[in-house]
Amino acid sequence: MRFAIVVTGPAYGTQQASSAFQFAQALIVEGHELSSVFFYREGVYNANQLTSPASDEFDLVRGWQQLNAQHGVALNICVAAALRRGVVDETEAGRLGLASSNLQPGFTLSGLGALAEASLTCDRVVQF
């Protein structure tokens, strides 16, 4: 079965993102296809490369990045939600005159069209 995941919670502070990550791992272990993860609202904080968890905590931002690198899962970030929350890539930082970017490699700023496409092409869309 082909799945897409929508994450609306931040990397830390709620259970949404970590539950989504564990679900994503379980899908892959069980042989399902995870085509994409779409980060929306507070979920865009999962792509902030400046996140620095305590040494005894799982680094969820890098966990998502590894999921992308090892399994080719697209990590799409809602561009409007990201810009409102200060998560920007180099292109947007330059366009907006910001000093630097902070989008973790492996993540892509995209519009709601990426979510719509996932909804149309996947058997299931699961939101956390």
From Swiss-Prot:
Enzyme Commission no: 2.8.1.-
Pfam family, any one: DsrE
SUPFAM superfamilies: DsrEFH-like
Keywords for this protein: Cytoplasm, Transferase, tRNA processing
Lineage: superkingdom: Bacteria
GO molecular function: sulfur carrier activity; sulfurtransferase activity
Residue positions of the active site: C78 (cysteine persulfide intermediate)
Localisation: Cytoplasm
Gene3D superfamilies documented for this protein: DsrEFH-like
GO annotation, cellular component aspect: sulfurtransferase complex
GO terms (BP aspect): tRNA wobble position uridine thiolation
UniProt cross-references to PANTHER family, sorted A to Z: PROTEIN YCHN, SULFURTRANSFERASE TUSD
Subunit structure, as described in the record: Heterohexamer, formed by a dimer of trimers. The hexameric TusBCD complex contains 2 copies each of TusB, TusC and TusD. The TusBCD complex interacts with TusE.
Similarity-based family: Belongs to the DsrE/TusD family.
Function: Part of a sulfur-relay system required for 2-thiolation of 5-methylaminomethyl-2-thiouridine (mnm(5)s(2)U) at tRNA wobble positions. Accepts sulfur from TusA and transfers it in turn to TusE.
Protein's recorded name: Sulfurtransferase TusD
Organism, as annotated: Shigella sonnei (strain Ss046)
Organism lineage string: Bacteria, Pseudomonadati, Pseudomonadota, Gammaproteobacteria, Enterobacterales
